[in-house]
C-alpha cells in the first residue's frame, strides 16, 4: 500500500493576479519540496522564457520572479495516495482538496486561474466546484504530455502575458 502524500504550500505574494493550479506535485517535486522539481517538466522553461529569468536559476529566485509578476502557484490536492508521479495513478477515493475558499478569500486580487493540464481542471471542478474567477485549462507542462515544447510555450505565453 502506498503512503499518503501531502502537497506543498502555495507560492503566492500580496497582489497576486493569477493562479496556476496543478494537480499534485510529482515524487521528485515532493522530495525536493519544490514545485515542478522534475527537470524534464517544461514549467520553469516556459515561465522563465515568458518572464525573463533562467529556468535553472536557484529555486528561490524563480519563485521570487513569479511572485514579482503576480503569479501564484498551488495544486488542487492537499493529499492523496499515488504510486509514482502520474496523475492517472492517483487513487480517486484518496483525494483531499486544498481549501480554495480560504485561499481566494485571502487573495482577492487573483482574477484568473490557469489549470496546468486536464487532471488539475477535472479534479478541481469535481472536488471544489467552479472557480470563483474565470479559468482556463492549458496544456500540461509535464514530460508525459506529448505536445511539442514550442507549441506549449506559444499557448502558455499567450495566457501569461502581463
Predicted regions and their residues:
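A polyanion-binding, active-site-adjacent surface
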Residues: 1-112, 118-147, 153-159
Amino acid at each position: 500500500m502506498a503512503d499518503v502524500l501531502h502537497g506543498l504550500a502555495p507560492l503566492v505574494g500580496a497582489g497576486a493576479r493569477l493562479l496556476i493550479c496543478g494537480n499534485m506535485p510529482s515524487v521528485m517535486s515532493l522530495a525536493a519540496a519544490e514545485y515542478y522539481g522534475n527537470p524534464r517538466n517544461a514549467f520553469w522553461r516556459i515561465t522563465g522564457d515568458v518572464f525573463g529569468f533562467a529556468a535553472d536559476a536557484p529555486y528561490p529566485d524563480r519563485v521570487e520572479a513569479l511572485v514579482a509578476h503576480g503569479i501564484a502557484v498551488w495544486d488542487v490536492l492537499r493529499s492523496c495516495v499515488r504510486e509514482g508521479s502520474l496523475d492517472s495513478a492517483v487513487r480517486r477515493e484518496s483525494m483531499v482538496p486544498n481549501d480554495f475558499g480560504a485561499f481566494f478569500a485571502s487573495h482577492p486580487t487573483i482574477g484568473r486561474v490557469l489549470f496546468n493540464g486536464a487532471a488539475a481542471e477535472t479534479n478541481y471542478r469535481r472536488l471544489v466546484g467552479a472557480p470563483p474567477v474565470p479559468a482556463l485549462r492549458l496544456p500540461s507542462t509535464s514530460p508525459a504530455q506529448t505536445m511539442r515544447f514550442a507549441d506549449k510555450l506559444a499557448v502558455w505565453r499567450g495566457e501569461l502575458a502581463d
